[in-house]
């Protein structure tokens, strides 16, 4: 692989280019009509069948029940059969962006009648899908070719008529092999993150499952922690600098995030300033899934407070035991025990006052806290590695395509 300049406009090569095994350059990229390398496939299904229904999304081709979370009921007459290794895309878009996905899931699958099915001939399918999904020039051109107002349509005829600079088949194969290795590495890392989180949930359930007091005595949460309501402020208090106000958006994956910060320029009493080892919790939100999200305040953070929809749980135990309890199923089962199917979008002090938790002796509790915190660090490092891999992939794609 070599960095190749194409700034003179004569040679069409990406900034990052592969070479032949003998070190020589591949031929320059040449303008090609997609219609020359696309072969449509038009077999459909009618009546009863045993095909899986797939959905094409920007996250890839997925089983419909995985995409929606449950099996959907549809009349599948006229759905398009998509053989293994063939490509599809949804021709309608709300923002002019389209996703091209290859069936690597099932030997017997169908997609909506709105999903055109085709295969690439004399071209590498993996390369072409990555190219169509990642090249800024491709995205821009396809958005222009799509027609419509609120929802635009990229017809199959328009797609086939589009022309792009493409490398020869041998170079496509090399780029595709490289991307497949990188994609496999990313998926392996993602699998590791999922496995670590699953194991952590198992640890939490094991530690915080003492409901009958056979192992440790239980206490009310209010006996070992204080609950502090957040700051109420008006839009006129918001400023470019001042006190940082922690909100639900500042909690991401169990840690603090500072991508979306709000500051207020007003006097904040000492009682409304966070301290090291505090637990910040989202206690009210329009989305129930966000209620109960927590993060540990890892260090002293001067000039930092929290919003009215948040709460600080301040432990009296001098360790992280309370933080881990607040992430356990034992805690959530008590908080939402009476919700049934109703949408409860807040946690009150009264609810927290009624929560109970097992309380081991000090030394045992510190061992538990250390074990769980060590595991949190493993998860954090694994997630950072995953993020770095995904950012590396994104940067490489910008340089691998013209």
Describe every region a protein language model picked out.
Residues 47-55, 144-145, 234-241, 338-339:
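Short coil/turn segments at secondary-structure boundaries
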């Amino acid at each position: 692989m070599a960095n190749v300049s194409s700034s003179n406009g004569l040679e069409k090569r990406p900034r990052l280019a592969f070479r032949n095994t003998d070190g020589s350059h591949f031929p320059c990229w040449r303008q090609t009509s997609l219609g020359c390398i696309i072969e449509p496939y038009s077999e459909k299904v009618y009546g009863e069948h045993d095909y899986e229904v797939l959905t094409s999304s920007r996250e890839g081709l997925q089983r419909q029940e995985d995409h929606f979370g449950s099996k959907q009921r549809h009349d599948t007459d006229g759905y398009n059969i998509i053989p293994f290794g063939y490509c599809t895309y949804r021709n309608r878009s709300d923002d002019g962006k389209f996703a091209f996905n290859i069936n690597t899931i099932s030997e017997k699958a169908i997609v909506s009648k709105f999903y055109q099915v085709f295969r690439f001939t004399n071209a590498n399918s993996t390369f072409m899908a990555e190219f169509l999904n990642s090249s800024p020039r491709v995205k821009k051109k396809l958005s222009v070719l799509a027609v419509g107002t609120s929802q635009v349509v990229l017809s199959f005829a328009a797609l086939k008529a589009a022309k792009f600079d493409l490398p020869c088949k041998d170079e496509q194969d090399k780029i595709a092999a490289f991307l497949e290795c990188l994609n496999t590495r990313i998926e392996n890392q993602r699998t590791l993150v999922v496995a670590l989180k699953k194991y952590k949930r198992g640890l939490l359930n094991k530690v915080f499952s003492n409901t009958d007091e056979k192992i440790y005595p239980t206490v009310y949460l209010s006996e070992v922690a204080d609950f502090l309501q957040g700051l109420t402020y008006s839009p006129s208090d918001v400023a470019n600098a001042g006190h940082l106000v922690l909100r639900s958006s500042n909690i991401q994956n169990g840690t603090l995030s500072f991508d979306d910060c709000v500051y207020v320029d007003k006097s904040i009493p000492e009682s409304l300033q966070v301290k090291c080892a505090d637990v910040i919790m989202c206690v009210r939100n329009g989305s129930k899934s966000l209620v109960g999200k927590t993060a540990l305040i890892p260090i002293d953070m001067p000039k930092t407070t929290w919003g009215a929809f948040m709460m600080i749980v301040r432990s009296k135990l001098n360790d992280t035991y309370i933080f881990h309890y607040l992430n356990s199923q034992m805690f959530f089962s008590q908080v939402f025990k009476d919700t049934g199917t109703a949408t409860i979008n807040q946690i009150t002090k009264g609810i927290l006052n009624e929560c109970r938790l097992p309380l081991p002796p000090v030394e045992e509790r510190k061992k538990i806290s250390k074990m769980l915190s060590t595991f949190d660090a493993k998860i954090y490092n694994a997630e950072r590695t995953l993020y770095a891999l995904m950012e590396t992939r994104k940067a490489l794609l910008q340089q691998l395509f013209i």
